[in-house]
Amino acid sequence: MAVTISIKEKAFVQEGRKNTVLENIELSIAPGEFLTLIGPSGCGKSTLLKIIAGLDSEYDGSVEINGRSVTAPGIQQGFIFQEHRLFPWLTVEQNIAADLNLKDPKVKQKVDELIEIVRLKGSEKAYPRELSGGMSQRVAIARALLREPEVLLLDEPFGALDAFTRKHLQDVLLDIWRKKKTTMILVTHDIDESVYLGNELAILKAKPGKIHKLMPIHLAYPRNRTTPDFQAIRQRVLSEFEKTEDLEYAEGSGI
């Protein structure tokens, strides 16, 4: 397995009160899989992603990537945030290379290959201020892929983009996934996006965050949002998502 996750509990203590964010999370993600995570606000999706990334180690449980325990950030995990977080004083190719020497022929070759993959050929010397939001996010994706991570973690990477750019970048991401065969885990609030991208989909419930439903998406790529099969799966996901909201209301009301 590429990623195995076993979290008994992740909790915060605030003003003497314990707030359990995640509880009894068990996931096994195969190499090359594209898992999408969806759930209501406050269900711990982003917290789970940070735990897998090694950015949060204060929990009861374990995370392994190809048999190695995750205790801190490392080159085996790539992380993409909603904001691109590019360095404004660096060009596109310099941002992708980050702390590696762009004058090294091997580094330059990898950077050039990634620029081609994320469809930014011709913009190598541009600065972030000269890029659109979608272009900036493509630079961030290329930067995360430079060290060839075993798992790419994406925390709502297209959430701040307009609908047209968002759909375009979804196709770019799928193209990268097919070419690089990198295991991907993407957090989203968008049901359409979760069905369009993932070959496996996990729905979380909140308070505390738990896996409500794990669903394989048996649709061939490339996917067409207008087909009856796509719409049927989307409706199933929506129905399960609505159940998590009903559960939250019932538990909060003591029903």
From Swiss-Prot:
It is found in: Cell membrane. Induction: Repressed by sulfate and cysteine. It comes from Bacillus subtilis (strain 168). Its main location: membrane. Keywords: ATP-binding, Cell membrane, Membrane, Nucleotide-binding, Translocase, Transport. It holds the Pfam family ABC_tran. This is Aliphatic sulfonates import ATP-binding protein SsuB. Belongs to the ABC transporter superfamily. Aliphatic sulfonates importer (TC 3.A.1.17.2) family. It catalyses: ATP + H2O + aliphatic sulfonate-[sulfonate-binding protein]Side 1 = ADP + phosphate + aliphatic sulfonateSide 2 + [sulfonate-binding protein]Side 1.
